[in-house]
Amino acid sequence: MAIILAIETSCDETAVAIVNNRNVCSNVVSSQIQTHQIFGGVVPEVASRQHLLLINTCLDQALQASGLGWPEIEAIAVTVAPGLAGALMVGVTAAKTLAMVHQKPFLGVHHLEGHIYASYLSQPDLQPPFLCLLVSGGHTSLIHVKGCGDYRQLGTTRDDAAGEAFDKVARLLDLGYPGGPAIDRAAKQGDPGTFKLPEGKISLPQGGYHPYDSSFSGLKTAMLRLTQELKQSSAPLPVDDLAASFQDTVARSLTKKTIQCVLDHGLTTITVGGGVAANSRLRYHLQTAAQEHQLQVFFPPLKFCTDNAAMIACAAADHFQNGDRSPLTLGVQSRLSVEQVSQLYERN
């Protein structure tokens, strides 16, 4: 058992959590959505300044809610990569300071590994190997999870991440920011079969298509052209039907690639992580397909789909128990493959 205090500031959520192995003692998340809504997206400089304003309050709230004190905390963990460099720096500086002042071990955590570990918070008995579909505003990946720190990326996006595509299409339809929840709400009132939209396929030099990689640029362009055509009509823009058709196309495409990937690699379990894991249509299609193929699929609770520090603490706990420690000289990295997690640690 390990009691870990973790900090997450990779983008626009300031989060602090305390986790005892895989049991959440406290989970504080301060979202900046309202701050960034007027800009239609995250402004890195604004995000960093907000983290500076919020981090101490979040730390105090997490400690108070957990009922624990510093003597019980065994290690300090923080997201160090990937993410917005300035935002990451706020969390890393706070974590290093706490580690030095309270003389605790320090662990830097990969953000995507945190999303992989989010499923453990509701499924503590989950065991590798399994396939993780990681879909968020910055990432769309199919990751073969072999064990703690042992990952192989089997598929990725060649252009926009799924969450990024949702944000851009929501802006196109004047649905606001963040786009994922806005499109999901509108789609519930629409018919997903109204418009036929293209699924992104990546051509291979030898012919055929890449089975696991995604592309959303063509779908985004198709939505733009379709919307422009419909606006030339005197009829009101069918926003709900457009949202439903777009969402269903993305969900079907991701489901098809995920099922093919898990079957090709002889796996029987799928987990889903990242903000887009909250999407109702993706959950429907994946659960239906998994049942058809007699596979298990696990989604984190909605509160652990978006960025949070509980998932970071959960990942750090396994590394801590494996004897992994990070040097206090470890810096932030705005880009780092999940396959390179081992670079963050020194094994004791």
Swiss-Prot record:
EC nos: 2.3.1.234
Chief localization: cytoplasm
Cofactor detail note: Binds 1 Fe(2+) ion per subunit.
Enzymatic class: transferase
Localization annotation: Cytoplasm
Catalytic activity: L-threonylcarbamoyladenylate + adenosine(37) in tRNA = N(6)-L-threonylcarbamoyladenosine(37) in tRNA + AMP + H(+)
Binding locations of Fe cation: 111, 115, 307
Keywords: Acyltransferase, Cytoplasm, Iron, Metal-binding, Transferase, tRNA processing
Family: Belongs to the KAE1 / TsaD family.
UniProt name for this protein: tRNA N6-adenosine threonylcarbamoyltransferase
Organism placement in taxonomy: Bacteria, Bacillati, Cyanobacteriota, Cyanophyceae, Synechococcales
